[in-house]
Amino acid sequence: MALERTLSIIKPDAVAKNVIGQIYARFEGAGLKIVAAKMIHLSRAEAEQFYAVHKERPFFKDLVDFMISGPVMVQALEGENAIAKNRDLMGATDPKKAEKGTIRADFADSIDANAVHGSDAAETAAVEVAFFFPGLNIYSR
């Protein structure tokens, strides 16, 4: 088992529903530590840069529009196999297909407004964590 860090974003739909604490409780209940966190309202440029990997995909504009529609809660999570653990907690991208008891099954409305983002691999996690928390703004505990 490997100690890993991953990025998690609680998206505008879940922030608006006031379920940040419930989602944090799930992270902590699964043994993940929140080692950095901040609430921000992404600019269009920030959202486009963060999701640049999807720039050529048909959903890119809608994704960016959604991500700038309200504040988001961004956190770096740390723990054993944090990337896979967080992805299991999130559930399938489409909340209709997400397993009961996952974050998306419980809090998401649609495949677009799907409550959370999580890094999908160690390489992307490193880039995504550095995007939001450059330098020494992460505190292992």
From Swiss-Prot:
> Which CDD domains does this UniProt record tie to the protein?
NDPk_I (cd04413)
Q: Which residues form the active site?
A: 117
What are the alphabetically sorted keywords of the record? ATP-binding, Cytoplasm, Kinase, Magnesium, Metal-binding, Nucleotide metabolism, Nucleotide-binding, Phosphoprotein, Transferase
Which residues are noted in the entry as ATP-binding? 11, 59, 87, 93, 104, 114
**GO process terms (BP):** CTP biosynthetic process; GTP biosynthetic process; UTP biosynthetic process
Catalysed conversion reaction = a 2'-deoxyribonucleoside 5'-diphosphate + ATP = a 2'-deoxyribonucleoside 5'-triphosphate + ADP; a ribonucleoside 5'-diphosphate + ATP = a ribonucleoside 5'-triphosphate + ADP
The family database entries (Gene3D superfamilies) matched by this protein are listed as: Nucleoside diphosphate kinase-like domain
EC numbers on record: 2.7.4.6
Q: Which InterPro entries match?
A: NDK-like_dom, NDK-like_dom_sf, Nucleoside_diP_kinase
Q: Does the keyword Transferase apply?
A: yes
Q: Which GO terms describe its cellular component?
A: cytoplasm
Which cofactors go with this protein? Answer: Mg(2+)
GO-annotated molecular function: ATP binding; metal ion binding; nucleoside diphosphate kinase activity
Kindly report the protein's main subcellular placement as a broad class: cytoplasm
Where in or outside the cell it occurs: the entry states: Cytoplasm
Any single Pfam family the record assigns to this protein: NDK
The family classification in the record reads: Belongs to the NDK family.
Q: What does this protein do?
A: Major role in the synthesis of nucleoside triphosphates other than ATP. The ATP gamma phosphate is transferred to the NDP beta phosphate via a ping-pong mechanism, using a phosphorylated active-site intermediate.
Subunit description: Homotetramer.
Can you name this protein? Nucleoside diphosphate kinase
Source species, please?
Ralstonia pickettii (strain 12J)
Query: What does UniProt list as this organism's lineage?
Result: Bacteria, Pseudomonadati, Pseudomonadota, Betaproteobacteria, Burkholderiales
